[in-house]
Amino acid sequence: MLNRTPQLLGPFDLPETLQTTARLVKEAGLEERITFLSGDFNRDPLGGPYDAVLMSDILHYQEPDANAALVRKVHQVLNPAGRLIIKDRFLDEDRTTPPWTAVFAVHLMVNTEKGRCYTLREASNWLTAAGFPEIREIERSSIVEGVK
């Protein structure tokens, strides 16, 4: 992503996770190009303003209220016309397809306290409630975008 997007700032993640990320970035020779933002996205300020925020594989580890609050929080730190891109594993409305996501949903139910897979409609509802007037499904069952 850094090679394709020169203006990319860098990841916001927990300090423990960023240690691994920093090592990988250094191995790729990109340490001069990236700024690490350390914190807990549910509790700490996100900084900003930003033109775009990518939330990757976050929703399925949280409860619906936490997801709705996080989407609202991201909306507040976006520039006008800013984009929130959510990459996750979305179930179809029948909650049994696509097959890989349905299997992953069972894995989350068995192995986590709060984890589950959501539908695209649920994610879209969080985006709408946060104030995103434009919502697009970018890739079926995995990527949705809200434009401020």
Language model feature labels by segment:
Residues 2-148:
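Alpha-helical subdomain
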